[in-house]
Amino acid sequence: MTVTTPFVNGTSYCTVTAYSVQSYKAAIDFYTKFLSLENRSSPDENSTLLSNDSISLKILLRPDEKINKNVEAHLKELNSITKTQDWRSHATQSLVFNTSDILAVKDTLNAMNAPLQGYPTELFPMQLYTLDPLGNVVGVTSTKNAVSTKPTPPPAPEASAESGLSSKVHSYTDLAYRMKTTDTYPSLPKPLNRPQKAIAVMTSGGDAPGMNSNVRAIVRSAIFKGCRAFVVMEGYEGLVRGGPEYIKEFHWEDVRGWSAEGGTNIGTARCMEFKKREGRLLGAQHLIEAGVDALIVCGGDGSLTGADLFRSEWPSLIEELLKTNRISNEQYERMKHLNICGTVGSIDNDMSTTDATIGAYSALDRICKAIDYVEATANSHSRAFVVEVMGRNCGWLALLAGIATSADYIFIPEKPATSSEWQDQMCDIVSKHRSRGKRTTIVVVAEGAIAADLTPISPSDVHKVLVDRLGLDTRITTLGHVQRGGTAVAYDRILATLQGLEAVNAVLESTPDTPSPLIAVNENKIVRKPLMESVKLTKAVAEAIQAKDFKRAMSLRDTEFIEHLNNFMAINSADHNEPKLPKDKRLKIAIVNVGAPAGGINSAVYSMATYCMSQGHRPYAIYNGWSGLARHESVRSLNWKDMLGWQSRGGSEIGTNRVTPEEADLGMIAYYFQKYEFDGLIIVGGFEAFESLHQLERARESYPAFRIPMVLIPATLSNNVPGTEYSLGSDTALNALMEYCDVVKQSASSTRGRAFVVDCQGGNSGYLATYASLAVGAQVSYVPEEGISLEQLSEDIEYLAQSFEKAEGRGRFGKLILKSTNASKALSATKLAEVITAEADGRFDAKPAYPGHVQQGGLPSPIDRTRATRMAIKAVGFIKDNQAAIAEARAAEENFNADDKTISDTAAVVGVKGSHVVYNSIRQLYDYETEVSMRMPKVIHWQATRLIADHLVGRKRVD
């Protein structure tokens, strides 16, 4: 690292203090490596002087056990918030240095395995921060002045033969890094001076939406990394048959447009022959003949088990092939090892160790839409419908469909009852719902549903009970293979793409001793798991069910599955049974919608209200936002019958607008809070809701009525609320935009040489445009975080022209350019299309397309519905748990301290970080982690996705 100016403030000497011998030695080692300092002090047990030509740093040892414990606790706290909060807001001391090469700093910190935060982004930082062993925040900046705001991307390294094959370093294995690429389409890195690896991909077992996205990502990332890409047609059947007809080399353009197609374009088939050794022997021979030395399998547990067996037998298979003269000595030496990797393509979501499988959310989407449609006809005739869904031994589809459609009853294999119990339970719930005026009855049956004695429960059994015992006009709907059909939803396309990239990384990094990896998603991060261990855990569920050990079967499911089941039972009972809480623990809780409509808002209101009823709380709705309350006292207690159907409706049933409390009338709002004696408040909405919570929390000193627990559930398609990686409505909006883009792309494909510039909403957030770009394979995307430079625009026009030339004579010809509305104030989508058309000089033309408020979506997606339910119930729990913390403060008016952390923490944002639900104080978020003028969080968590999207379409980025 080159330190050109010692400290940002110009000083050249600094002293830091260690309070234990261990931290003292660690600090000497840290600063020696980090700042390339030399130890220039004479031997001394209590101090060390480190320096170079620009800096002198003295480290003192002052042993103090008490202070050292505090330092260790502070350091532990800072490490725990590395990915979620800005260290600078928690720092007691900090040092900041200047550097001429911030990339070298980043590489040094990565080599040291030191924690790291970068601003404005970790990809292209102007400032980098780490933690020293003494609890200090140590920063480095490349800017020349303190108010510089334009990030300077680090220089890209030249590709060389020494580039490491590790996803932990920047190389061909990391598509989320900016590197020098060629000027021609597709823009790829210069080839390395090493033998080309040949990577094949195959899909096996049952097809699943998203498999094509997985294949596309594997083929293109393999090519991007200098490898040859092959596909094995018709699954294991293609391996056994072999030859160029079944093992084909694919090139960049061969997978163009595949993301928008359902099923698997390379085919899949069940192959009994591969289960025999002779079949696997043929498969090995055919792979060797094609020169393939790495295989990625996308399929379920059976397909992945076969792949791992194939790899374990590989040494003996090739020995036998050599002995029988079916391969040459040269082939034997070159193909001694086969690297295998698995990605899970299954609509059942039954694979242990991963939170989601490719295709599961698409199948759930089909089921929910089908039930939404069925409910309309059920309501017309006051009928009951028994809906059978897939899932084998996993009840995930049935459970989440039950939550998303507010079904009356569900049958899942993990929680069976005796034959008489399930009949009594179902009839009790259905009759209670009917007696309260519900005209429809929906019962969801998983195909693996069983009674406690392992007797299968069929839709016919359920139909018979509903007819015979309740006299309901009942119909059976078996969705069957409709659940597998159609194009993948946005989540599955993105998941399949990111897992495809990591699968290529995994096979490139594998050694003969590395266990076969499975690419999984845990806490929203793509990770590798041992393949066979995952398969064994998956099969253990079925074994536990067969052994009637249902407690173990449930324990093998992830904690979120159990939470969903408890949530379903709570919201389904509503106020039909005796409340769980005693009268003195029951609360009055209000809910209000603030900001623009977003998918899932109604689901949150419905779930909050029904959960409150089941506990004994009284739910209130504030209609038409803060202005409705201040002007018209629009407050109403919610009752169950009035909310029927809300779980699956779009928009906002209780009304919403962008008015904040200060704009409406804080005094009147406080008056009505006091009049109705609210014990808690839930706000659902976007950045205006975030502002509202901030204003109410700040007003607590003046208005005692606001001294109650208050919580915000983020809901906005922009996904720009600080404190969460996910806002309700963003998935619905992403799917609406994706479907619009698919249709527009089809139109562009029909007209040769046509590109569409699609205007995306999102305010100053590029989330929607970024993820839609990845999901639909857009050639270019422009977002507010980067803007539109003339140099990049010129490069993009030339790149588009070349891509049209390459695609000549092929199908799926259309091109898409996504532009966030605020990416440029000067260039609207219309103006941008005109500029592109003029500069293209007749080689192609561009037209604008405005999806507008269509992006808010119609029916909310199942992801938004189920997450709304989860977050609403968490919000009610937060209010209940924080009553005691603020109760005393409410009573002691004179001694009220709004700055007390215990008090300020009772106003929070409930958010999703990874797969965890977290609570962040509104004061902490607003003061330290928000760019208020930009209506954005300071840390952009989706930044790396942009480079992945660009690399997968061969776009060249201009630094």
UniProtKB/Swiss-Prot annotation:
Listed result of changing residue 718 to D: Abolishes sensitivity of the holoenzyme to fructose 2,6-bisphosphate activation
Additional free-text comment from the UniProt record: Present with 90200 molecules/cell in log phase SD medium.
EC code(s) of this entry: 2.7.1.11
Function: Catalyzes the phosphorylation of D-fructose 6-phosphate to fructose 1,6-bisphosphate by ATP, the first committing step of glycolysis.
Pathway: Carbohydrate degradation; glycolysis; D-glyceraldehyde 3-phosphate and glycerone phosphate from D-glucose: step 3/4
Gene3D superfamilies tied to this protein: 2,3-Dihydroxybiphenyl 1,2-Dioxygenase, domain 1 (3.10.180.10), 3.40.50.450, Phosphofructokinase domain (3.40.50.460)
MF GO annotations: 6-phosphofructokinase activity; ATP binding; fructose-6-phosphate binding; metal ion binding; mRNA binding
Gene this protein is translated from: PFK2
Documented activity regulation: Allosterically activated by ADP, AMP, or fructose 2,6-bisphosphate, and allosterically inhibited by ATP or citrate.
N-terminal catalytic PFK domain 1: annotated span: 2-573
Active site (record annotation): 348 (proton acceptor)
Family (UniProt): Belongs to the phosphofructokinase type A (PFKA) family. ATP-dependent PFK group I subfamily. Eukaryotic two domain clade 'E' sub-subfamily.
Ranges that cross the membrane: none
A Gene Ontology term for the protein's cellular component: mitochondrion
Residues bound to beta-D-fructose 6-phosphate 1: 383, 475
Positions that bind beta-D-fructose 2,6-bisphosphate 1: 754, 847
Effect of residue 301 to T: Reduces maximal activity of the holoenzyme by 30%
Modified residues (Phosphothreonine): 152
Biased composition (Low complexity): 158-167
Protein name, UniProt field: ATP-dependent 6-phosphofructokinase subunit beta
Binding site for beta-D-fructose 6-phosphate 2: 346-348, 390-392, 447, 481-484
Positions contributing to ATP binding: 206, 270-271, 300-303
Subcellular location: Cytoplasm; Mitochondrion outer membrane
InterPro entries: 6-Pfructokinase_euk, ATP_PFK, Glyas_Bleomycin-R_OHBP_Dase, Phosphofructokinase_CS, Phosphofructokinase_dom, PKF_sf
Catalysed reaction equations from the record: beta-D-fructose 6-phosphate + ATP = beta-D-fructose 1,6-bisphosphate + ADP + H(+)
Region entry Interdomain linker, spans: 574-587
Cited PANTHER family: ATP-DEPENDENT 6-PHOSPHOFRUCTOKINASE, PHOSPHOFRUCTOKINASE
